[in-house]
Design a protein with these regions (language model features):
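Alpha-helical transmembrane segments and their helix-start/interface "positive-inside/aromatic belt" motifs
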Residues: 27, 58-69, 125-144
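Hydrophobic alpha-helical transmembrane segments
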Residues: 35-45, 110-113
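Membrane-interface helix-loop-helix modules in multi-pass inner-membrane proteins
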Residues: 69-136
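Hydrophobic alpha-helical segments of integral membrane proteins
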Residues: 46-48, 82, 150
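Membrane-interface interhelical loops and short amphipathic "cap" helices
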Residues: 1-30, 58-59, 81-102, 155-178
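Membrane-interface helix-loop junction between the first two transmembrane segments
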Residues: 41-60
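Hydrophobic alpha-helical membrane-insertion segments
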Residues: 69-77, 136-155
C-alpha cells in the first residue's frame, strides 16, 4: 500500500490579518534581500576572478572591505521574508526544513564561516597578500547557502516528495529532482 502524499500536508494555521498584507510584506522584504544577496555573491565572484587574474588590481581590495558588511546586511534583510514565509506557509516550510534539517541547521555554521572568510580576505588584502583562498572559499560557501535555501523552497513546494523522508529519516534528504 502506498502513502497518499496529500495526507502529509498539515492544516493551515490562522493568521491575524488578511493574507495579502503578509504576502505584500513578504515580496517587499524579499526584494530587498535579493538586492543585497546579489550584491554579495556578485561582488565575491568578481573579487575572486580579479584576485586570480589580476592580483595587483585594487578592485578586490575595495570589494573585500565592503563584503563583510554586505553579508551582514544580506542576512539581516533575509530574516523578515523568512518570518513572513513562516507565517504564510508555515506547515510547508517547517516540514521541508525538518526533512532536510542537517543542511538547514548547518546554514548557520556555513554563513558564520563565510563571514569569517570574507574578513580573512579583507585582512589579507590590507597586508598586501592575495587572499584568493579566503574569497574562493567564501564564494563556495555562499553558493552552497543558495543551493540549500532553494532546495528547501522546492521541497516545500513538492509535498509529493516528502514521502522520501520515511526512507531517509536522518534529516539529510535533498530535493535534487527539480
Amino acid at each position: 500500500m502506498s502513502m497518499n502524499p496529500a495526507a502529509l500536508i498539515p492544516p493551515a494555521d490562522s493568521i491575524p490579518v488578511h493574507w495579502a498584507w503578509l504576502e505584500g510584506f513578504l515580496l517587499l522584504t524579499f526584494g530587498f534581500h535579493l538586492l543585497f544577496m546579489n550584491s554579495v555573491v556578485g561582488s565575491a565572484v568578481i573579487a575572486t576572478v580579479r584576485a586570480v587574474t589580476r592580483p595587483q588590481d585594487p578592485a578586490p581590495t575595495l570589494l573585500g572591505k565592503a563584503l563583510p558588511s554586505l553579508l551582514a546586511l544580506t542576512i539581516n534583510f533575509g530574516v523578515a521574508p523568512l518570518l513572513f514565509a513562516q507565517v504564510l506557509y508555515g506547515g510547508f516550510l517547517y516540514t521541508s526544513s525538518v526533512i532536510m534539517a542537517v543542511y538547514w541547521l548547518g546554514l548557520i555554521f556555513v554563513l558564520i564561516a563565510a563571514y569569517y572568510l570574507l574578513y580573512g580576505f579583507s585582512g589579507s588584502r590590507r597586508k598586501k597578500k592575495n587572499g584568493t583562498v579566503f574569497i574562493a572559499a567564501a564564494c563556495a560557501l555562499l553558493l552552497f547557502t543558495g543551493f540549500v535555501l532553494v532546495n528547501n523552497v522546492t521541497l516545500m513546494l513538492s509535498p509529493d516528495r516528502w514521502v522520501g523522508y520515511f526512507e531517509k529519516q536522518d534529516g539529510s534528504m535533498l530535493n535534487l529532482g527539480d
